[in-house]
């Protein structure tokens, strides 16, 4: 444990001098992996080969819902080759997450580039009293999931400066901010783009076994909210009782070239007025969408022909437009008042730059879309699901153990493959239908996957923002290395992992709803029940 803080920024010993051979091996293995796009391309080639073998062997199953005989189909059949080549553009454009991400990013790009996200994050951190700094920063980190990479660029360095000004070690600020942004990425207070993305991948996977099944974008809200509530005191305890005592108090100054006022990002009068107008626009947008649901006699976003939560299906479907409108309107209002958006041409340029930033995702989506489509054409998804469900049913494992196993699998993969959507695109067509046949809802399966996927984000050098956070730490302590970073963040990963396992186990055991209109359990149609009990 360090008893005295560094005398000045950039000096002093690293957090931990120990270097583990296992870390070097993981780093070498991770660096040897290709880009996620090539991983998906490889998965497609493997899928084609498996489909050929399965079709030749006559591998199949009986759909327990419809009674239909499912037969594996070779992807090298003439029909599938023609379908692949003719429908290639439609395969990409029909990929559900692509439209969701592009639509929301049109608005989010304006909110980010106008400075709205930075002003909101900065303004929230600067006003925090020192005793409540740790939990407040963690909660702001949860909210900042909507700001994407802006949270790493703005909140983490800003929090380090705020902690240093308060006489606390700046790396403590880095640790709690990074834990909130990335370590607790599965949790959130308000659903956002990532919910749309992940549940958008889940929907077609669920429809492999139940074509009528619908997944709404809020399907994980109660679970992600519970993560935020549970992880906040845990992160507070780990920070104040483990991380900070080890680092000690800070007696140094600010890094070279950083003035205190500039470092803390003091808002100008125009920026403060911009935040006020952004708040007004947010209130208007929320009011309009609420009126479209709650209008007397039934609003346009309420389906009066349905009963219960299904009445809100049009509202759930409109959330993509709601997020886009909210980000666009608030960002435009803030930028127009603060001076970052001078004309409508500036607005259009920001939206275009947002599309440029998601270009790598479009490339990934092309291969993910074709993997999902080819999986469906081969019939391997439902065949694997039915046979896998039969095998698991024979083992008679409890549902909590099944979901904890999925959590562990996604955690292990996260050490090597950073893209949550790429991994879920490959896993969902198998695990979602399989667990549906065992009574677990697609939303609960997605929630368990997301929990596991976020635990090791903060300790794997392969995470996309890990190098950025490491550089921020090195501004304060020059010899701070990868091992130091692992040692700094590992207590959070261990604590979050244990808490996550407990939460998933309790949630599915109590059959709590995962989100609005999204139960933790799945009740198959009568046909599947009959197939399990046999004829009377």
Feature map (PLM): residue ranges:
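Membrane-interfacial loop-to-helix junctions in multi-pass transporters
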Residues: 79-80, 90-98, 125-136, 170-172, ...
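Hydrophobic alpha-helical transmembrane segments of multi-pass integral membrane proteins
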Residues: 101-102, 129-160, 165, 362-368, ...
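Interfacial/capping segments of alpha-helical transmembrane domains
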Residues: 52-81, 194-198, 297-307, 378-387, ...
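Interfacial loop/helix-cap signal at membrane boundaries in integral membrane proteins
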Residues: 17, 21, 60-95, 208-216, ...
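Hydrophobic core segments of alpha-helical transmembrane domains in multi-pass membrane transport
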Residues: 40-55, 101-109, 140-142, 180-184, ...
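Intrinsically disordered, low-complexity non-transmembrane regions of multi-pass membrane transporters
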Residues: 1-32, 61-76, 244-273, 520-536
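Core transmembrane alpha-helical segments of multi-pass membrane transporters/permeases
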Residues: 36-45, 49, 70-118, 312-382
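Membrane-core helix-loop-helix motifs of multi-pass transport proteins
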Residues: 27, 31, 156, 160-251, ...
């Amino acid at each position: 444990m360090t008893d005295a803080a560094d005398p000045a920024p950039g000096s002093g010993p690293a957090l931990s001098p120990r270097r583990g051979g296992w870390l070097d091996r993981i780093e070498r293995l991770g660096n040897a992996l290709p880009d996620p796009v090539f991983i998906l391309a490889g998965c497609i080639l493997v899928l084609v080969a498996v489909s050929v073998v399965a079709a030749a062997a006559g591998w199949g199953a009986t759909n327990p819902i419809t009674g239909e005989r499912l037969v594996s189909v070779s992807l090298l059949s003439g029909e599938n080759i023609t379908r692949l080549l003719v429908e290639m553009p439609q395969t990409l454009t029909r990929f559900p997450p692509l439209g969701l991400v592009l639509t929301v990013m049109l608005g989010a790009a304006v909110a980010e580039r106008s400075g709205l996200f930075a002003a909101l994050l900065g303004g929230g951190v600067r006003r925090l009293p020192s005793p409540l700094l740790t939990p407040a920063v963690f909660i702001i980190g949860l909210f900042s999931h909507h700001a994407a990479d802006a949270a790493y660029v703005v909140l983490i360095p800003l929090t380090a400066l705020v902690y240093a000004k308060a006489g606390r070690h700046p790396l403590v600020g880095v640790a709690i901010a990074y834990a909130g942004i990335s370590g607790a990425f599965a949790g959130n207070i308000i659903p956002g783009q990532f919910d749309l993305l992940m549940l958008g991948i889940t929907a077609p996977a669920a429809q492999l076994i139940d074509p009528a099944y619908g997944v709404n974008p809020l399907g994980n809200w109660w679970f992600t909210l519970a993560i935020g509530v549970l992880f906040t005191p845990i992160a507070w305890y780990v920070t104040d009782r483990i991380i900070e005592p080890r680092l000690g108090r800070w007696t140094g100054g600010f890094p070279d070239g950083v003035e205190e006022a500039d470092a803390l990002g003091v808002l100008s009068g125009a920026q403060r007025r911009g935040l006020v107008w952004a708040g007004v626009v947010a209130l208007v947008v929320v009011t309009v969408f609420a009126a479209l649901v709650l209008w007397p006699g039934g609003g346009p976003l309420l389906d009066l022909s349905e009963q219960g939560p299904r009445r809100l299906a049009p509202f759930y479907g409109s959330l993509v437009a709601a997020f886009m409108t909210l980000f666009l309107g608030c960002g435009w209002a803030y930028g127009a008042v603060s001076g970052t958006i001078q004309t409508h041409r500036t607005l259009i340029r920001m939206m275009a730059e947002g599309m440029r930033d998601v270009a790598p995702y479009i490339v990934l989506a092309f291969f993910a879309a074709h993997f999902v489509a080819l999986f469906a054409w081969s019939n391997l998804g439902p065949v694997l699901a039915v046979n896998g469900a039969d095998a698991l049913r024979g083992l008679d494992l409890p549902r909590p153990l099944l979901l904890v196993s999925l959590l562990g699998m996604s955690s292990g993969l996260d050490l090597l493959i950073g893209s949550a959507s790429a991994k879920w695109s490959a896993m969902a067509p198998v695990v979602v239908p399989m667990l549906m046949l065992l009574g677990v809802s697609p939303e609960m399966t997605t929630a368990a996957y997301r929990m596991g996927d976020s635990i090791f984000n903060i300790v794997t050098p392969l995470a996309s923002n890990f190098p950025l956070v490491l550089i921020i730490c090195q501004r304060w302590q020059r010899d701070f290395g990868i091992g130091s970073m692992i040692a700094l963040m590992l207590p959070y990963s261990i604590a979050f992992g244990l808490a996550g396992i407990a939460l998933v186990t309790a949630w599915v055991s109590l059959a709590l709803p995962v989100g609005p209109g999204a139960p933790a359990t799945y009740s198959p149609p009568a046909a599947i029940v009959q197939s399990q009990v046999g004829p009377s």
